[in-house]
A protein has these predicted regions:
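Short, positively charged and aromatic/hydrophobic N-terminal segments
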Residues: 2-3, 7-9, 16-26
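Acidic, glycine-enriched active-site microenvironments
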Residues: 30, 40, 44, 48, ...
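Glycine-rich oxoanion-binding loops at beta->alpha junctions
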Residues: 73-98, 383-418
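Short Gly/Thr/Asp-enriched flexible loops that form oxyanion-binding sites at enzyme active sites
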Residues: 108, 115-119, 426-448, 468-471
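Mixed-charge interfacial surface used for oligomerization/domain docking
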Residues: 145-149, 161-164, 168-299, 333, ...
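A generic structural motif
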Residues: 298-307
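Charge-rich, low-aromatic oligomerization/scaffolding segments with amphipathic character
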Residues: 308-325
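N-terminal glycine-rich anion-binding loop in soluble enzyme alpha/beta folds
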Residues: 347-405, 409
């Protein structure tokens, strides 16, 4: 028997110490052992195989939700495994490193089930510097139970069915064969057979003519490991040959009805002491369905479909420290896969204030800003609303802070959109106010490729004014304008946009330090109500000062009257911080002057609420292109 090129095989004599021997000494009394380095190599090659087939997995993603993101989710987890896994002193410790990385990087239903399988594998293996292939096979078989137990309602014909077949076949082969590549190949052939059966086990797969995407992802993982065993080539030199018939991946026409009971695919990772996985799973069932809970007593990776992600997180914040959270809009994902209005995707951040109806109708993709309060991270407009945040901050003098979307969050959405669109236009909050623009620009440069254009536009605005620019950009896309023409138009529109914010309480300005305590007391005593705007570069400045709400309204009226002497207002909106009545009063005044109602009235983001304070109302407008040179 010959060693593989990567020298992955070691042998040991039964009931003796572990040591290597030469090929000529091999006989039936010897069997295989695996080291920490070798098991890590297997997993890294398997991970690369999944990443290489991300697009195929997205294309066949039908169950449980036809959102076309299984490939992206699994690829994201595999990248985390590649980047964070480490070789340790024992095989068990190495597998724990892999499992921890998987829990951190897991995305989606399949990702979390896969992560729990890896957790089960790490917990089932013996803690030694090497293990036999029989011991590895036994641990793989036991790991399947962990995967099953993590799911609320296990369904056959999915990833778990293929995992079970892999574990069973590996056990059988390990007792009858001595060459590790032959053992893996035997088990892989049975895994392929189980994969093909998924096409008939689930009606939705049979109708679509595809195998289960998650099951295919696991099969690719095994195939990558097997390729390494048989060839031993480095990843850069590998030419991976698919062994599964291409007919399994015939293009499909999604026919999802969009009538799912729950809209948001909600995920998180919590850490703590004595976490009870079964208790989490039972409680989470009351918030939605598709519940998957993976992990151990130290950490838990959670997946659930729900309409109330804020309620889910309110419960989970009590169970441990929130390390990671992610919420996907399945309605939006289904729209992307089946009902794209254009091949140009439109993205903005959650500081842009827009009604959900416009966001849905215009297929606008939102990247949510992180809100930090008392060591807890919230997702703006998803896991917390402005009113709730202000109510919390009233309890003490701690003012919530915000954090721009991180590079990984941005990369995930742009990478996902690249699977379905030809180009992306991103409109960000003023880069003077946030690092969002710079983060998007850096990620866009990283993801640059010939057939996928990404343009990042600094709106130099925020809140309602940013919302108007996003709405206008969506209209340009709907008209069928080219990518470059749209970018040029929007950049010109930014100079014709304006926001005026009535700050009706100075409490948050005092808490933040923008106004000293002494000056704040004086300003509050005389009833000062400043009007804040953004200058030409997007920096916040004071536009005027009034001494009552009525006085502030009068100043806004005068501002609009002055503007309309030389300009025409194309459209305007009004946004507010928990002050619907105040917004309606201002709307009535503006309609009388401008001659038409606002295009919408809506609540602000939590970010704006923290800055402007309770009851703030903002008027934003966009002028027509017939603008004189006079400044406004």
């Amino acid at each position: 028997m010959n060693n593989t090129k990567c020298d992955i095989i070691k042998r040991e004599r039964r009931n003796s110490n572990y040591y290597s021997i030469s090929d000529t000494e091999y006989n039936g009394g010897w069997f295989i052992v695996i080291t920490s380095r070798q098991v890590l190599d297997l997993f890294l090659h398997g991970a690369h195989k999944v990443i290489d087939n991300k697009e195929m997995l997205n294309r066949i993603n039908v169950f449980p939700v036809q959102d076309g993101d299984t490939g992206s989710n699994l690829a994201s987890m595999m990248r985390t495994i590649i980047h964070q896994s480490e070789e340790k002193e024992t095989v068990k410790a190495t597998l724990e490193s892999v499992a921890d990385a998987a829990l951190y990087g897991a995305r989606g239903n399949s990702g979390i089930i896969f992560a729990q399988y890896l957790t089960g594998l790490s917990e089932s293996v013996i803690d030694r510097d090497t293990i036999s292939i029989q011991e590895y096979a036994q641990a793989s078989n036991l790991a399947v139970k962990y995967a099953y137990e993590s799911i609320e309602n296990p369904v056959e014909g999915t990833m778990i069915s293929v995992m079970r077949e892999w574990g069973t076949a590996l056990m059988h082969a390990a007792t009858n064969k001595d060459v590790i590549s032959e053992i893996f190949e035997y088990a892989f052939e049975h895994t392929q057979s189980a994969l093909k059966k998924t096409k008939e086990q689930l009606e939705v797969l049979r109708k679509a003519g595809v195998v289960d995407s998650g099951a295919q992802g696991f099969t690719f993982f095994v195939e990558g490991a097997l390729y390494f065993l048989k060839n031993g080539a480095s990843l850069d030199q590998s030419i991976i040959i698919d062994t599964i018939n291409d007919t399994l991946f015939t293009p499909i026409e999604m026919n999802h009805t969009g009538e799912d009971e729950y809209r948001y695919c909600t995920e998180c990772l919590i850490e703590g002491i004595g976490i009870e996985q079964h208790v989490l799973k039972e409680t989470l069932k009351t918030f939605g369905d598709s519940v998957v809970v993976a992990g151990n007593t130290r950490k838990s990776r959670i997946h659930i479909h729900t309409n109330e992600p804020a309620q889910v997180f309110e419960y989970l914040y009590q169970q441990g420290s929130m390390v990671f959270q992610k919420i996907d809009d399945m309605f939006k994902q289904e729209t992307v896969v089946n009902h794209r209005k254009s091949q140009i995707a439109l993205v903005t951040d959650s500081i842009a204030d827009l009604p959900q109806e416009i966001i849905d109708d215009e297929q606008i993709h939102i990247v949510h800003i992180d809100i930090l309060y008392k060591n807890i991270s919230y997702k703006d407009k998803l896991t917390i609303r402005a009113k709730t945040l202000l109510d919390l901050s009233k309890e003490d003098n701690v003012l919530p802070t915000s954090s721009q979307p991180g590079p990984k969050q941005i990369e995930n959405i742009l990478d996902y959109l690249s699977s379905y669109y030809d180009s992306v236009i991103v409109l960000t909050v003023s880069k003077v106010l946030s690092g969002t623009y710079n983060n998007f620009s850096k990620v866009a440069e990283k993801l640059k490729k010939p057939n996928f254009k990404i343009s990042i536009v600094n709106t130099k605005q925020n809140s309602g004014a940013q919302g108007l620019l996003v709405k206008k950009c969506a209209e340009y896309i709907s008209k069928g304008m080219t990518h470059d023409d749209i970018v040029d138009k929007i950049q010109a529109d930014t100079a014709r946009s304006k926001i005026l914010v009535q700050v009706l309480t100075l409490d948050n300005m005092i808490k933040s330090g923008r106004l000293s305590l002494r000056a704040g007391k004086i300003a509050k005593f005389i009833g000062m109500t400043p009007i804040i705007t953004l200058d030409e570069e997007g920096q916040g400045v004071i536009d005027g000062i009034a001494f009552s709400t009525e006085g502030s309204n009068k100043k806004l009226v005068k501002h609009i009257q002055k503007i309309m002497k030389n300009h025409k207002i194309a459209e305007y909106n009004i946004v507010h911080v928990n002050n619907e009545d105040g917004a309606k009063r201002l709307s009535d005044k503006m309609e009388t002057i401008i001659g038409k109602p606002p295009v919408y009235i809506t609540e602000t983001s939590s970010v704006i609420a923290v800055s402007a304070g309770e009851s703030a109302v903002a008027l934003s407008y966009l002028l027509t292109e017939e603008v004189s040179n006079e400044s406004f």
